[in-house]
């Protein structure tokens, strides 16, 4: 059964279940001819890089950053104009153009981007994503995030994102101290439940929210809500 927002509202009269998978569409994966010059060996700051000459399975973990304003409209290594509002990325050696799924390992959010540029060449960063991609991954304000990247081969199924973006909002508070106190009490109440979910405090614009999760699916989140009902007092928050 598909759980619509209305159905979830009825299921969670006290809790708010929300997902972050409703953001703008990712890059659409398609087979493309590799760019000749953008995939040649090159040197930056005395170090030589040799790009991959074919799209194949590849995974990598490390730090990601994003680039925006002052690069917007400039030419990329693939000869296109950089658009910070599109779902694109820069990588030192992945084929241009190619597609990867980028997953923020801290919050589980993911996005599919099209690699059309080279970089980043700063510190230990492995990928530069567009501002739009960084917004979807949830690290625009932080500037960097630890990520996992997975090469997508056209014609094959895209790697499935680990579903770590479904949470139940328990209650919101005006101060972090109040939220932490509530979290501690809720953790004690939920310790004996079958799901025994993780609890955390998230700072939002004007409040601190105690949330439970992540869960692998909306169905699993609804089950956890049913187990937790009566153990803690919750409020519905719009997702």
Curated annotation (Swiss-Prot):
Annotated InterPro entries: RlpA, RlpA-like_DPBB, RlpA-like_sf, RplA, SPOR-like_dom
Domain of life of the organism encoding this protein: Bacteria
Annotated ranges, domain SPOR: 160-239
GO BP, sorted A to Z: cell wall organization; peptidoglycan metabolic process
Range of residues in the leader sequence: 1-25
Statement: the UniProt record of this protein carries the keyword Membrane: no
Family matches, as Pfam families: DPBB_1, SPOR
Entry EC number(s): 4.2.2.-
UniProt keywords, alphabetically: Cell wall biogenesis/degradation, Lyase, Signal
PROSITE patterns reported in the protein's UniProt record: SPOR
GO molecular function, one term: lytic endotransglycosylase activity
Keyword Lyase set for record: yes
Function: Lytic transglycosylase with a strong preference for naked glycan strands that lack stem peptides.
Family: Belongs to the RlpA family.
PANTHER family reported for this sequence: ENDOLYTIC PEPTIDOGLYCAN TRANSGLYCOSYLASE RLPA
Record's protein name: Endolytic peptidoglycan transglycosylase RlpA
Organism, scientific name: Neisseria meningitidis serogroup A / serotype 4A (strain DSM 15465 / Z2491)
UniProt lineage: Bacteria, Pseudomonadati, Pseudomonadota, Betaproteobacteria, Neisseriales
């Amino acid at each position: 059964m598909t759980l619509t927002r209305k159905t979830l509202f009825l299921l969670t009269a006290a809790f708010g279940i929300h997902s972050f998978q409703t953001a703008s569409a990712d890059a659409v994966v398609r087979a493309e001819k590799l760019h000749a010059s953008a995939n040649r060996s090159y040197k930056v700051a005395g170090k030589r890089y040799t790009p991959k000459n074919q799209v194949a399975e590849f995974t990598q973990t490390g730090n990601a950053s994003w680039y925006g304003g002052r690069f917007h409209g400039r030419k990329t290594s693939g000869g296109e104009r950089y658009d910070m509002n599109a779902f694109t990325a820069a990588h030192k050696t992945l084929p241009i153009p190619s597609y990867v799924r980028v997953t923020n390992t801290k919050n589980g959010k993911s996005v599919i981007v099209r690699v059309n540029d080279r970089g980043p060449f700063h510190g230990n960063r492995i990928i530069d994503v567009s501002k739009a991609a960084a917004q979807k991954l949830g690290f625009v304000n932080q500037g960097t995030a630890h990520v996992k990247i997975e090469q997508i081969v056209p014609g094959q199924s895209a790697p499935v994102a680990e579903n770590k973006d479904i949470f139940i909002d328990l209650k919101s508070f005006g101060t972090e101290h109040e939220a932490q106190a509530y979290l501690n009490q809720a953790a004690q109440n939920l310790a004996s439940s079958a799901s025994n979910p993780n609890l955390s405090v998230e700072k939002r614009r004007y409040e601190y929210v105690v949330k439970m999760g992540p869960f692998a699916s909306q169905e699993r989140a609804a089950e956890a809500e049913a187990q937790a009902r009566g153990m803690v007092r919750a409020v519905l928050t719009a997702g």
